[in-house]
UniProtKB/Swiss-Prot annotation:
One of its GO terms (molecular function) is cyclin-dependent protein serine/threonine kinase inhibitor activity. This is Cyclin-dependent kinase inhibitor CIP1. The modification Phosphothreonine is found at T65, T69, T73. Residues 1-30 are annotated as: Disordered. Induction: Cell cycle-regulated gene mainly expressed at G1 by the transcription factor MCM1. Expression is induced upon stress. Expression also depends on transcription factors on MSN2 and MSN4. Keywords: Cell cycle, Cytoplasm, Nucleus, Phosphoprotein. It comes from Saccharomyces cerevisiae (strain ATCC 204508 / S288c) (Baker's yeast). The keyword Cell membrane does not apply. GO terms for cellular component: cytoplasm; nucleus. It comes from the Eukaryota. The gene is CIP1. Phosphorylated during S phase in a CDC28-dependent manner. Phosphorylated at Thr-65 and Thr-73 by HOG1 under osmotic stress. The phosphorylations of Thr-65 and Thr-73 are necessary for CIP1-induced growth inhibition. Disruption phenotype: Accelerates the G1/S phase transition. Residues 1-11 have a biased composition (Basic residues).
Amino acid sequence: MLLERLHKRLHAGSSRRSQENKDKNCKPEDALPIQPEAQHQTQDPQPLLNCDYDDMIAFDRNLSTPVFTPVMTPINNSSSNQAKSSDASYFPPYLNANRTRQNSASSLASSVSDFAQNFKQHTFYNNNAQFTSFTPQFVGLLLEVYQNTCSDPTITPFDTTNPPSGILNRVAKAAIQQSELQQLDIGCDRNSWLLTLVRQRLLQEVRKDGYLSRNTSLTSLPPPPPPQFSEMLRVPSPFVNADITDPIPLSNTNSNPNVSSTTSLTNTLNWYSLQRSNVSMKNRNGSSQYISELQPQPILARTNSNNSVSNSNAFSLLTPTPTTDSAFNFNIALLSRQRSNIISSPLASTRLPTANVSTEESSILPNESLKLKRDLLRLKR
């Protein structure tokens, strides 16, 4: 009995120990093994390629610097044969190569451009002291050669106020050759720039001549100022004068005018001549006239005539009368025209006598007509 009890106790103890050992040694199937954490290596930032973040492919999370795969490969245009054009330029590529020639002043014709050469040469002309050191004798010779060239019938007609470069070159060469033959002093050294300087000086002189001839023509003169302005400026107006005398001698050519009338005539006729200078004027054929004083011209004086058929115009006979005043101006014709309009008015026709004039009284007639004209002018004012 005792042996059986001992055996049961031993068997129960051993079974308990074996069960405990089984429980300790058993492992669950679902449990995963614990792995150590991965150690990340830090690296410097690397430049990205030309791509967008939306176009990237997934990368490995274990890497700190992912590798990007661009969808589009960049194209290198540096080896292309086309010229590089700016973003603001709208010209085609084949025109950009010639834009330097198109934008230059030398590509324009001489009738369009104010400068015959490019900007560098134009700056050289302005900065060079020899450009303005030509002697007046050489400048006169240059203009004379130019006038002879303009009057040459074998040359194709051109604008004389803006000649082309071929004419400038021809005239400059001829002027330099003539100055050498005549041993004329030019005023500057004879070097490689001489022909260019002479061409530029000729172009300046021709354009200045055309400008002065346009501004000094009779049609470009300003209109006469009003009487109040002429009194303020103390300028004798040719149309308004309190003590006006007839500047047109109505008597015979042998009669001498008074000193006072001559003085008033000179002041009246010099009203416009003070504004004019002695310049070279050019006509359409290219010939120039150096006008120092306007030549005297015959004046048409109006005298009374005996006309029994027509009494509408009492002063209808025109007789040319020479004048000796060298400062003749077109104001004389304007004065005579105004007087003729006043005399031909209805008021003048009622006041003028229509009696027959004999040969003996012809010498007295001009004095009476002067008085009548003065009265009519005072009434007209």
